[in-house]
Each structure stands twice: as structure tokens, then as C-alpha cells.
Amino acid sequence: VPATGSPRRPDGLSETTAAALLRVSTATISSQLRKAGLNETFIAGVRPGDPSRRLLGRARTLRYLPLREDVFARIGNGMNAQKRAVESLSPGDVLVIDCRGELGAGTIGDILALRAQLRGAAGIVTDGGLRDTEAVRELDIPIFYGGSHASVLGRRHVPMDIDLPVSCGGTLVNPGDVLVGDGDGVIVIPPDLVDEIARLSLEQERQEAFILSKIRAGASVDGWYPMDAAARAQYREATDTDIEKASTP
């Protein structure tokens, strides 16, 4: 949870779903997405500016292409795609920047990050470099980034497209996907699955809290992780909950 304030609930998410997603870990969400048949949902290689801050929001996408000087001269200056993307952000939006994993230039810095914050954005995710890293990390907006680089984006990139499917950290992100971020990184949830994934993830963490209580009390992991029939019976008796669907793999 952020050090100050609370993330705004993105439009279209129920209070119950948003509360669950702000509580559960990306690791747990990953387990439930895998059970749903989705294995490629974690944005690899991005780190949080502040691991204590949670991210929750809907994706707005920005795509950078490799630098070609004549193209940059035509479309890269002034109110380019990067600046238009920032100016179009609404409360609950997460700006997802596809930089092809290129770390040889900055992709956003403190001025545009501040503007995103003031427009109510829920966060920024870039698989490229971050400029003005210390200043950005002090802002009141979650930021996940691939690395730090002092150079402007024009050293390696042309800002090209807004609100198209992109690849960020090797993961496909569609505009409108739900993003959750924590100390491990950022995970992508398809909107049509988000309510069920949130519910099952919350139940999985309840189960794991029960398992942890047994391990702390001296129990072996054998029979408890994963839970066998006897352990499941104990959990049902203690919680009056059907655990079959959400149980830890």
C-alpha cells in the first residue's frame, strides 16, 4: 500500500475486486492466471521505484520504435506521442511504455512523470530506462522501470503509437488490461478474468496463511504444502471454506 494515500479504484473494477487486488501478491495472481491457462502475464525485468507502493490500474499504452533520425525529425519533437499519451491519462490509468527492453536511453523523466501524477494516473511501467530517477522516485506515483539512464529518449527511440497492443518486458499488454504491481514486479490480468482471479487469489492467500501458521507451529511441509486431504479437512473445519478450486498448486 502506498506510503501516502490509497490508489484510486480504476473505473469498471468493483470495490471488492479492487480491495482484493491491492491485498494479494503478484506471485499469487500469477499462480491463479497459470491455472486459468495464462503463463505469459508477468512483465519481466522491471523494478519498483519504491517496493512498498502497490500499483493497480488499467493499461494505457505507448510504443517506442528504434531510432531513425529522419523519422524522429518528422514526428519526435513537440507534442509527440509520448507527450500526447501523458496528456491523455485519466484517473486509474497506468502508462505502459514499450521500449523493446532497450536500456540505452531514458524513456520518461520527472516532468512528464509529475504531469502523469497530477492527471491522476495510477502508475507508470516502462521496460526501458528512467531519467531523473531519484526525483521520479520521490513523486506520489508508482513507477516500475528497467534501469536508469540519463540520456533523452531520442538517443535510441522514436515515440510512435498510443493505445495499441504492445510488448512490455516481453509480455503482451492490451489497452484496458488490469495491471497489479508490488515488490516482485508487474502482472497483467485480462479484464474478463479479473473478478474471478481476484477472488481466487484472495482465497489462495487465506489458505497459505493457514499453512504458514502450521509450519510456524512445527509442522512439516509434507501434507501441508500442498495440502493433502487431511490438511484440507482441517482448513475447512477452521474456516468453513471450500478450497478445492483456489488451492495452492
Question: Where are each of the predicted segments found?
Answer:
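Feature captures the catalytic cores and cofactor-binding loops of soluble hydro-lyases/lyases
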Residues: 2-175, 189-249
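Channel- or pocket-lining gating/hinge segments that regulate access to a cavity or pore
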Residues: 185-187
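Beta-strand-loop-alpha-helix segment that lines the small-molecule cofactor/substrate pocket
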Residues: 182
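C-terminal binding/interaction regions
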Residues: 179
